[in-house]
């Protein structure tokens, strides 16, 4: 293939000063095989200058691959010194070694080592991603490299859609992406046919002519013959280092730099994070079924938490609405010390004068006397046992009792002890046949004839007996003409809107204590009941949510298990990313982002399912509905993110700790 590669390596300090680019002094590498120590390299001394074309040749097991791994900063020497461009590598940490690989070395592998789920363009871009190169510059450089190597029509092809020769050319482009000052080619033609192998060698020779330092690692003398210097390794030692008759290619003077790096650390970090999301998305959609199964536990957990929260809010609203329907902002005053006081009936101190005094309080909107007793009512030949209530005209406002028809009695009716009544829906049904007008009819209450002037609306309140029959008449009429009772059974007080009921209750107690001189009464604050209901509802919702959280935890464990499997399956991918310059933090971030993305997507689906359940719930349950709150949605997203981080950490940490050499060797 006749072509010219214009992307030349950047000049280095070693090149400018004539120093060796790579220097090994007394390098040995030992491995433990069980209890025995194995010496792979023995006292290696080697210098390679910039622009050289070197072949390292040796039989299988000779140590040439170990030497290449040390040269490429994939491995560390057990002893001795190795310098890259004058920088000692012995004391560098993993991230610093990754930076050396990223900025100085380009790897070409025998088996290409392309990521199968990425197309050619994205495979080539990977080193630049970890170098923090902006996206536009990265895309442009990758396209130009692939075009120069004859792959312009295969940018969107995945490795499985390319021939062996094409895959190796993609691998070469990837090696050049960050400049490729040193090209390390491990058996670059070993898996290719003769024509493709010749094509790849021509590319490597042209790269050498362009000024790149090219190191071939091979067992094939024919491949080694292309080099200007051949280093033979046997039993972990250099047994021969000779130059061939080939002339040393001179580096070109016009150096075109690699793609421009991100100017600021923050920009680079954001770019890496964005790319991590893109790569995570590609990895997830390439294993759709596994991703869906991984999400399943999260989906169930989030659906449970959000739905239970919505059901709890709906139930609380339903109960509070019913409490408000029987009189919100209301305080009732009764004789005795508390409900169930056996002496309460003997206490007859509540009086109409107390009602008058209460009505004068600033905090009180209205106060009404209440007396009541069971009574017999009759209309023609139909009679019924009802609860007779003597109240003031304000009672219906205090208790939020709406009228279906007619009016309530007035203050004038009360003064005149008018024989008028308001009946409830159940009494109307009991006394009057369907179609019979109740208003204006005269019924007997005990022995007192009374005219029906109003009918209340049907009451389906949770806190009111649905089958009870009630009749209301003016307090003065009930006390003077029916019951013969002057003291009150209770007083109902309505608080002005916007005022704290607890404070008003204290003032009411203070006034009543002053009037009576003793605590012969007690109060019942409906707002306190509402607060109790709210507190109980929150407690129940929390309890049920904690139960639902268990399914979230189970889902999180499922995510961790699948991610651990994913790390095992993608070990070689991790090795490839490390070889091209990924730091441990980059690998850790990659797998953490994948775990969080799985959980977030599962959370979104779970929230959607919850809304679907809410829609179906509304179709079949008419009395009340599920109430979704922004807080529950935010909580769901926070839970999803935390589950992803917590249960994705161990797989991400394991991935980041992998040895790049072992990872690359994994099938």
Swiss-Prot record:
For this protein, the record's SUPFAM superfamilies field holds:
P-loop containing nucleoside triphosphate hydrolases
User: What's its EC?
Assistant: 7.6.2.-
Keyword flag Nucleotide-binding: yes
The residues covered by the ABC transporter domain are 22-260
Q: Write out the residues that bind ATP.
A: 58-65
> What does UniProt give as GO cellular component?
plasma membrane
List the transmembrane segments.
292-312, 540-560, 601-621, 630-650
Instruction: Write one Gene Ontology MF term.
Output: transmembrane transporter activity
What does the UniProt keyword field contain?
ATP-binding, Cell inner membrane, Cell membrane, Membrane, Nucleotide-binding, Translocase, Transmembrane, Transmembrane helix, Transport
Q: Is Nucleotide-binding tagged as a keyword?
A: yes
> Where does it reside?
Cell inner membrane
Q: How does it sit in the membrane?
A: Multi-pass membrane protein
Q: Which family does it belong to?
A: Belongs to the ABC transporter superfamily. Macrolide exporter (TC 3.A.1.122) family.
Functional note: Probably part of a tripartite efflux system.
Question: Which PANTHER family does the protein's record reference?
Answer: MACROLIDE EXPORT ATP-BINDING_PERMEASE PROTEIN MACB (PTHR30572:SF7), MEMBRANE COMPONENT OF TRANSPORTER-RELATED (PTHR30572)
Record note on quaternary structure = Probably part of a tripartite efflux system, which is composed of an inner membrane transporter, a periplasmic membrane fusion protein, and an outer membrane component.
Name of this chain's protein: Probable export ATP-binding/permease protein MacB
Please name the source species: Pseudomonas entomophila (strain L48)
The beginning of the lineage is: Bacteria, Pseudomonadati, Pseudomonadota, Gammaproteobacteria, Pseudomonadales
Q: Which gene encodes it?
A: macB
């Amino acid at each position: 293939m006749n072509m010219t590669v214009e992307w030349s390596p950047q000049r280095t300090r070693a090149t400018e000063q004539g120093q060796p680019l790579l220097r090994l002094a007394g390098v040995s590498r030992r491995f433990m095989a069980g209890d025995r120590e194995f010496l792979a390299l023995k006292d290696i001394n080697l210098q390679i200058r910039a622009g050289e074309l070197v072949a390292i040749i040796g039989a299988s097991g000779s140590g040439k691959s170990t030497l290449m791994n040390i040269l490429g900063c994939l491995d560390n020497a057990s002893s001795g010194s190795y310098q890259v461009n004058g920088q000692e590598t012995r004391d560098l940490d993993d991230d610093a070694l990754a930076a050396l690989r990223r900025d100085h070395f380009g790897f070409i592998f025998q088996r290409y080592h392309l990521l199968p789920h990425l197309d050619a363009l994205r495979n080539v871009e990977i080193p630049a991603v970890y170098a923090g190169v902006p996206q536009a510059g990265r895309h442009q450089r990758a396209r130009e490299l692939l075009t120069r190597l004859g792959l312009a029509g295969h940018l969107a092809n995945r490795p499985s859609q390319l021939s062996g020769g094409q895959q190796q050319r993609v691998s070469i482009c990837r090696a050049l992406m960050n400049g490729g000052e040193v090209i390390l080619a491990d058996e670059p033609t070993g898996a290719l046919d003769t024509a493709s192998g010749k094509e790849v060698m021509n590319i490597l020779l042209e790269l050498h002519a362009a000024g790149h330092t090219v190191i071939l690692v091979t067992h094939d003398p024919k491949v080694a013959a292309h080099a200007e210097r051949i280093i033979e390794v046997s039993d972990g030692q250099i047994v021969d280092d000779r130059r061939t008759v080939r002339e040393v290619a001179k580096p070109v003077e016009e150096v075109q730099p690699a793609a421009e790096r991100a100017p600021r650390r923050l920009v680079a970090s954001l770019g890496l994070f964005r790319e991590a999301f893109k790569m995570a998305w590609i990895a997830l959609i390439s294993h759709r079924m596994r991703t869906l199964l991984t999400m399943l536990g999260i989906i169930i957990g989030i659906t449970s938490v959000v739905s239970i929260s919505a059901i709890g809010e709906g139930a609380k609203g339903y109960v509070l609405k019913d409490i408000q329907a029987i009189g919100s902002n209301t305080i009732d005053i009764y004789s005795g010390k508390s409900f169930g006081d056996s002496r309460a009936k003997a206490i007859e101190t509540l009086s109409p004068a107390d009602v008058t005094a209460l009505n004068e309080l600033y905090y009180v909107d209205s106060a009404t006397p209440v007396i009541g007793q069971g009574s017999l009512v009759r209309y023609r030949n139909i009679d019924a046992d009802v609860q007779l209530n003597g109240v003031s005209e304000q009672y219906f406002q205090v208790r939020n009792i709406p009228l279906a028809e007619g009016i309530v009695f007035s203050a004038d009716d009360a003064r005149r002890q008018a024989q008028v009544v308001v009946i409830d829906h159940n009494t109307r049904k009991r006394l009057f046949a369907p179609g019979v007008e109740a208003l204006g009819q005269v019924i007997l209450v005990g022995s007192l004839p009374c005219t029906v002037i109003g009918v209340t609306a049907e009451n389906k309140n949770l806190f009111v007996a649905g089958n009870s029959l009630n009749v209301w008449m003016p307090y003065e009429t009930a006390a003077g003409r029916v019951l013969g009772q002057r003291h009150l059974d209770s007083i109902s007080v309505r608080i002005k809107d916007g005022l704290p009921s607890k404070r008003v209750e204290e003032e009411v107690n203070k006034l009543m204590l002053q009037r009576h001189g003793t605590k012969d009464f007690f109060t019942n604050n409906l707002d306190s009941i509402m607060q109790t209901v709210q507190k109980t509802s929150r407690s129940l919702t929390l309890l049920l949510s904690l139960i639902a959280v268990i399914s979230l935890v189970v889902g999180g464990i499922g995510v961790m298990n699948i991610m651990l499997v994913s790390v095992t399956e993608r070990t070689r991918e991790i090795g490839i990313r490390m070889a091209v310059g990924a730091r441990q933090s980059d690998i850790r971030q990659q797998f953490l982002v994948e775990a969080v993305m799985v959980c977030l997507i599962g959370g979104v689906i779970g929230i959607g399912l919850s809304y679907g359940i809410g829609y179906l719930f509304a179709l079949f349950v008419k009395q009340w509905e599920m109430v979704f709150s922004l807080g529950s949605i935010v909580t769901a997203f926070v839970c999803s993110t935390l589950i992803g981080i917590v249960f994705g950490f161990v797989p991400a940490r394991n991935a980041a700790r992998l040895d790049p050499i072992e990872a690359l060797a994994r099938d």
